């Protein structure tokens, strides 16, 4: 063996590896720079992106970011009569429509089969800088003209080439994989009720497509056919919340899923929320009364802010009471290690900022004695706020406070079925972040009728109705997507279609604007009409705090 030749060969190999590593790093850096332009409106220099629309005032920074119109997926949208086309590399540079390789293009909003492809990077750059299309005609005035140097343009085009390029994990030729996540402290009755709805809905979907129709092969097919089975994976968590993230990442690696549907939580959902956002997995409308309020997060979606919405509603009432009736002190009662503690902490912050005295009384131990002590010793000018579940509401003393206004969490207490003692009913105002029973009755005919037909007992009505609702929402959104199974696109379709739904279950209306992640935004404040029964009286209109 020639040592000199071996050394030269090793040096050449080292140089090749170094060059490949540098090329990969360079491509990655360019893509990251392009992403910053696309999503944030920030140039590689750190300066804000500049865009102009004719004689109008210019756009700058985040307001000029491409995703504002073309969406996070880059697949475009439709705004009234304005069609915003997809701008991912797949659609910008697509093969000629007359060639066989064009047959596997999937339908997305804004995509026209007769749209000519851009022949090269220079033509795309001209459209971005000058607003001149590939046919030489001026683009719609809504398309800004962007001031990008060559390096910035190259980074943006590199990002667009890779954007929404691959089908998402959890999608195979014949199956869509979904997970539902259940925390270890979740109510077992609600768990069984939720899973029964999910399993039956999935079975119905799969029965509908039984027979083995093949996946769509061409966007030229006239009729859309649902062809993929739905596979449900149940991810039961164990142990302390700080271990849930690692458990979920392990499950996702073992069982890749397209999205997480429904789910059931207890005292905290924070680790699940963080997992969904960090792993870019849509997590759709779990059954949790203490969701995570991070409006800038993209992937988790919720029906309501839950008890956080109740905090806002009660705070508004307390503010009114302070101005009109001399409120001086807010006394809050909650059970140890329950979601009421977080709600009480949030309301405490508001009360202290408002200059009110605050008292927190923690219920510990079984029986009615600890609770009776917690709701005693009240004075004129006090407001008593109860963050209690049904079992504790039932243990309230028979005699209500004589000299305090009482507020109750409806979500925790059980809404109209809360076992509030008769003497408490006239003096208690209950936050009610769902529609009134008589007003939701017609809409509830759909989920309740489905449960009856499927011979599923009603054991946790709100959980079952919300689970049925999210199944229907997901089915409708996937129908709109055809074969474009991309996670970001799923979120965007949900934003666009949710406000059009007639079947909204417990909620008077649902809707998600761009970037919004709570579909129902309002609440009633109610009181009971009678010493017994479930009839409620609204103390005003549906209110969005």
Residue ranges and their predicted role:
Residues 300-304, 397-469, 539-544:
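Extracellular/periplasmic periplasmic-binding protein-like sensory domains
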Residues 173-175, 189-196, 208-295, 364-368, ...:
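Beta-alpha junction/loop-to-helix N-cap segments that form part of ligand/metal-binding clefts
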Residues 254-361, 404-430:
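Extracytoplasmic ligand/sensor domains, especially the bilobed periplasmic-binding protein
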Residues 24-60:
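Electrostatic cytochrome c docking/interface patches
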Residues 450-465, 475-537:
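Segments of small-molecule ligand-sensing domains
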Residues 39-42, 68-75, 92, 129-133, ...:
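Detector for the c-type heme attachment site
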Residues 51-121, 142-148:
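Gly/Gly-Pro-rich "capping" loops immediately C-terminal to redox-active cysteine motifs
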């Amino acid at each position: 063996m020639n040592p000199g030749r071996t050394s030269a060969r090793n040096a050449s190999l080292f140089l090749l590896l170094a060059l490949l590593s540098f090329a990969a790093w360079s491509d990655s850096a360019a893509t990251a720079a392009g992403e910053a332009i696309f999503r944030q409106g920030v140039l590689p220099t750190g300066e804000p992106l500049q865009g102009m629309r004719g004689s109008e005032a210019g756009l700058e920074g985040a307001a000029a970011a491409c995703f504002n119109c073309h969406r996070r997926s880059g697949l475009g949208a439709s705004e009234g009569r304005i069609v915003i086309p997809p701008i991912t590399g797949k659609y910008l540079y697509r093969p000629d429509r007359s060639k066989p390789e064009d047959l596997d293009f999937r339908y997305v909003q804004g995509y026209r089969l007769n749209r000519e492809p851009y022949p090269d990077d220079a033509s795309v750059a001209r459209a971005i800088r000058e607003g001149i299309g590939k046919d030489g005609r001026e683009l719609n005035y809504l398309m800004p003209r962007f001031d990008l140097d060559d390096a910035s343009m190259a980074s943006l085009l590199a990002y667009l080439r890779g954007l929404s390029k691959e089908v998402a994990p959890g999608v195979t030729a014949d199956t869509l994989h979904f997970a539902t996540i259940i925390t270890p402290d979740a109510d077992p009755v609600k768990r069984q009720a939720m899973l029964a709805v999910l399993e039956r809905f999935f079975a119905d979907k799969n029965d509908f497509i039984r027979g083995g129709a093949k996946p769509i092969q061409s966007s030229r097919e006239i009729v859309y056919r649902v062809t993929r089975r739905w596979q449900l994976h149940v991810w039961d968590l164990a142990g302390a919340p700080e271990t849930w993230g690692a458990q979920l990442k392990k499950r996702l690696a073992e069982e890749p899923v397209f999205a997480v549907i429904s789910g059931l939580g207890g005292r905290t959902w924070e680790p699940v929320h963080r997992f969904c956002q960090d792993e870019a997995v849509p997590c759709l409308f779990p059954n949790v009364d203490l969701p995570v309020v991070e409006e800038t997060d993209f992937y988790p979606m919720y029906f309501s802010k839950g008890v956080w919405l109740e905090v806002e509603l009660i705070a508004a009432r307390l503010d009114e009471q302070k101005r009109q009736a001399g409120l001086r002190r807010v006394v809050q009662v909650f059970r140890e290690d329950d979601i009421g503690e977080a709600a009480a902490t949030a309301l405490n912050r508001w009360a202290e900022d408002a200059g009110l005295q605050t008292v927190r009384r923690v219920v510990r131990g079984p029986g009615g004695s600890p609770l009776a002590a917690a709701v005693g010793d009240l004075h004129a000018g006090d407001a008593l706020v109860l963050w209690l579940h049904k079992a504790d509401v039932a243990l309230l003393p028979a005699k209500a406070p004589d000299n305090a206004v009482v507020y109750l969490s409806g979500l925790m207490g059980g809404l109209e079925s809360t076992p509030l003692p008769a003497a408490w009913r006239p003096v208690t105002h209950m936050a009610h972040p769902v529609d009134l029973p008589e007003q939701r009755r017609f809409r509830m005919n759909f989920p309740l009728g489905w449960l009856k037909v499927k011979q599923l007992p009603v054991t946790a009505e709100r959980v079952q109705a919300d689970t049925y609702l999210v199944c229907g929402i997901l089915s409708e959104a996937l129908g709109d997507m055809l074969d474009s199974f991309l996670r970001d696109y799923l979120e965007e379709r949900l934003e666009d279609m949710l406000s059009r739904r007639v079947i909204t279950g417990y909620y008077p209306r649902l809707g998600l604007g761009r970037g919004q992640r709570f579909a129902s935004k309002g609440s009633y404040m109610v009181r009971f009409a009678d010493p017994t029964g479930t009839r409620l009286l609204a103390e005003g209109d549906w209110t969005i705090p």
